[in-house]
Amino acid sequence: MSESNNNQALREEFNRWAEAGRGEGMEEDHLPITLPVLDLMQLAPDDNILDVGCGAGWLERLLSERVPEGRVVGMDISDEMVRRARRNYVALENTMFVIGGVDEIPWDANFFTRAISVESAYYWPDPARGLREILRVLREGGSAWVLINYYRDNPHCHQWGDLLAVKTNLLSAEEWSEQFRAAGFTNVAYERIVDSSPSPDVYTGRWFHDAAHLRAFKSEGALLIHGTK
């Protein structure tokens, strides 16, 4: 499948997610692993931040509070997700939402001081190209932060690839780090962010076999990779 076809498939799939209300529900699932990352980013009040794969915009609300003198741009390939984000957070004066894919970010070079992506990067059709684009729009000294739950070193998430309707990239921490370095990032490092939120006694969803499987997955932690331009 070509990159344009991959992007179209992603757009259609995440439009369906948006219409089902799944965009708004992502905050509950992702907040416990995202808050520690925001602390690690050491945001300044005047930072300009790009969120790649913003969904329905929940992270923009948190970011806008932390950078009151800066700008927050949420980008998503799903036009329906962006429509909902604009509706949900119309009152955020320093925030805007744009439709776009990471392979061709609709923004000028050297603008952002930080870029973040939460649970989006493994959907990118070409991670290397996406990271090069993020590097392009970052200022010198800016940093990129990619947070994912689906990665090769956590065996308890591998089943997701068969459950998702779109192509995914299951890479290891070392492979992601090499992608960062190949794109031109320096000071590349990675770590695990453990989800310490309570787990249910009984699990009836489709992503894990049972509650014990979910707990094992959470104990491995999400993978955070970051680097500097």
Where are these regions (language model features)?
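Class I SAM-dependent methyltransferase SAM/SAH-binding core
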Residues: 48-104
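Short, glycine-/aromatic-enriched active-site segment of Class I SAM-dependent methyltransferases
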Residues: 149-167
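Short alpha-helix
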Residues: 168-184
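A short glycine-rich, Lys/Arg-flanked "PGG" loop and its adjoining helix->strand segment in the class I
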Residues: 128-140
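A short SAM/SAH-binding and catalytic strip from SAM-dependent methyltransferases
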Residues: 114-126
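A short acidic, Gly/Pro-enriched loop at the edge of an enzyme's catalytic core
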Residues: 103-115
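Conserved beta-strand signature within the Rossmann-like core of class I S-adenosyl-L-methionine
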Residues: 142-148
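Conserved class I S-adenosyl-L-methionine
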Residues: 1-44, 58-62, 81-84, 88, ...
